[in-house]
Amino acid sequence: MYSGYNHYNRQKSSTGTTIIDPNSAWFAQEPHWPLIEDLLGGTYQMRSRHRKYLPQEVRELDESYDNRLARSVCPPYFVRLERMMAGMLVRKPVRLNDTSDDIRLHMFDVDLEGNDLNVWTYETARKMIRYGHCGVLVDAPAAGQAGRPYWITYTPREILGWRTEMIDGKLKFTQLRLLEKVFEPDGLYGEKVVEQVRLLTPGAYEIHRKGKNNEYVKFDEGTMSLPEIPFAVAYSNKINFMESRPPMADIAELNLKAYQLQSDLSNQLHISSVPMLAFFGFPQSSEEVSAGPGEAIAFPAEGRAEYIEPSGNSFEAQFKQIDRVEKQINELGLAAVLGQKLSAETAESKKIDRSQGDSTMMVIAQQMQDMIDNCLMFHGQYLGSDGGSCFVNRDFVAQRLEPQEIQSLLQLYTAGTITQETLLTQLHEGEVLGDEFEVEEEIEATESGGLREISEPIEEADESMPEQPADE
């Protein structure tokens, strides 16, 4: 039977009997992850998978395959595109609105790992774009213990299962299982990785670790100060609740194809770049003929020797095929995300493509914004303060206002058609004012006399002029 069926028709679900067993949604998503995860590891990771991504040809010796594998380099198209898309969201800092001062202070180290809100948003957006969605747990020390809330990001691979109920008109988690890895000291200098499952229920948690019989047993438990599970989710390509597909899976497949094509071309160029010396006219019964420096060859009457090398016509076709794959990657990446194509097109089609591309990124930005809003809400509930809301950048391409546009805004403000707040907001979004500029603070400063008026200098009397006598 064809062995490929073992991969494409593999088990999609299992009967969950232990706390470590994933649910059916996890099994439905898992086949889409390995290629993307291996591409993130770069050339070293792709080489370590050897025949999985770079097949060994029929009658190709193992030694020849190892040499070909060592010369193969995986181009980083997928990784660069993922970084570019995530970077668009934080091209301008995430803006907080109506957030209390203590929470704003926590946003400078949102995950207790030294990452501020913008860096955390960038890394979380990469995971969301990579897998299709991700979740964030707003955790905090138990009541009475020192510490403050912090945010932990989980990928779909680490979300093993969940249960939900409709409570007060909202779908809320009643059970959540999260896979974690923690590092613990091992001896004087070493460390070991411990795999554990965090089981969350409203107001409580349990930690389960693998025991001596390879069965997970309860290691720790406790209560949480919130009556619900503080877990927020954001999607980039939603299929069902807590289920998604990687939005760039097609680009990952094209990246793999480019890796294989470049490997084939590099191997053929390596072999054919050295011409082969051929001898003609020697009888088959003659001894083996060799040529080299300091050697003389006695040719038969009709014998001759010449170098044979390929014409290179097939190489041109392979180069063109690689160019076509790279063009497909550029068009899928730039056109679908930014609405820009490298090929020629009409102005109207550019507008349509731009709106579609912006809509794709708009959904990602809106999902990220909603998730941060929910995390701020949970964060505020822990502290008993107002979490407020946020605004995630939607200006994905740098577009600085032109001088004519700035002049038009100033004329509208002078005529009283727009307010000072509208003027400053447009100048700030148009990148005329810096990222650190705060519109509300500027308005308050001007209204309270923050702009100091410089008094006119007092003219000093000229000492050379005699004083005029006072009138009697």
Model-inferred region functions:
Residues 104, 112-121, 128, 250, ...:
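Short amphipathic alpha-helical segments
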Residues 317, 324-472:
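C-terminal helix-loop subdomains that flank or include functional centers
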Residues 129-238:
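Extended, regular secondary-structure scaffolds
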Residues 88, 92, 96, 114-120, ...:
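Short secondary-structure junctions and interdomain/linker hinges
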Residues 1-151, 459-472:
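Extended, helix-rich architectural segments
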Residues 215-348:
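Extended, charged amphipathic alpha-helical segments
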Residues 137, 177-179, 298, 391-395, ...:
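Residues in well-ordered beta-strands of folded domains
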Residues 120-124, 313-317, 359-360:
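Short secondary-structure capping micro-motifs at structural edges
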